[in-house]
Amino acid sequence: MEKIHTKADYLDSLKNRNLTIYLMGELVEDPLTHPIIKPSIEAMAETYALAEREPELASAISPYTNEPINRFLHIAENNQDLYLQNQMQRKLGQLTGTCFQRCVGMDAFNALHSVTYEIDEKYKTDYHKKFISFLTKMHESNLVIGGAMTDVKGDRSKPPHQQADQDLYLRVVKRDKKGVYVSGAKAHQTGCLNSHWMVVMPTLRLTEEDKDYAIVGALPIESDGITYIYGRQSCDTRSMEPGEYDVGNKYFAGQEAMVIFDNVFIPNEYIFMNGEYDFAAMLVERFTCYHRRSYVCKAGVGDVMIGAAATIAEYNGVENKSHIREKLVEMNKLNETIYATGIASSLQGKETKSGNFINCLLYTSPSPRDDATSRMPSSA
């Protein structure tokens, strides 16, 4: 694939793909034009548009190709990189008012950078080298990588190998000289249809009996054996009704889907964990550390919510009423708490053994993961 430079390039890259997608029980022929799916594509495309308009914020120089790439593809080489990721995330939240779907992939490969290195250190494998080779390939074309961690899980009191249905967690069902075959499902996968590649990862701490579930690998989203079940959200169908009013966020939307894997092949060159169950928890913990901090994007969405609430108050002539002003102030306090703790976490990051930087876990815990935007006063 030719390198993606612009929003238009990105939209062109999504054309003529062979994907099996079901939405409300029907097969989707063209996700690019479907009224429910299209706004989510526009939100993802905004990550490229921002890099065009503000390259110093939304792009970086690849350490592997020495060429500009989207910042969502960049490995954090210092605390400033972590900080700029947050600045970009808040800006995109302001621009789209929704999820722009690239944070999971960014946080996944930043976590994998150090975890693959430490697996190699213990087991003398070559995962880190293969991972860097894969990442270089992604940088050369400036692609979107999605992260797939959340399994369906089933009975939460039992580990994967004790589930009544073994497909409730993604697992290796066959190995050969060329790679592995996986089956199972990943739930609530953000922006998966709008990505070019996905990286599958375990979702929890594993034991030796769960070795087949300790798999990390990259694969194109068009891989044979994958089916996507699109997860519709409240009021989605309004976009399919005539007219332009009362559709909520008119231009942008988030996207989640269940991804079903039926004997899907992952070649050896794209496998970055294969049975090293004792590193599953490390990967989940490091991914979670990055991802909690990434909820700074919600501060950008919160800015939109606060602005909308203030505008509604003004339209109704109550913008100066004390109880309205009090609620708007409270919304701002909660929103800036999200931002402040995320930024504090990024600026106090530390270098890992592999040389990239991970943010401070302490400041992620009370921050965006608290999802303060969900507690903003609804009566404002």
Where are these regions (language model features)?
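Gly/Pro-rich turn-and-neighbor structural signature
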Residues: 117-181
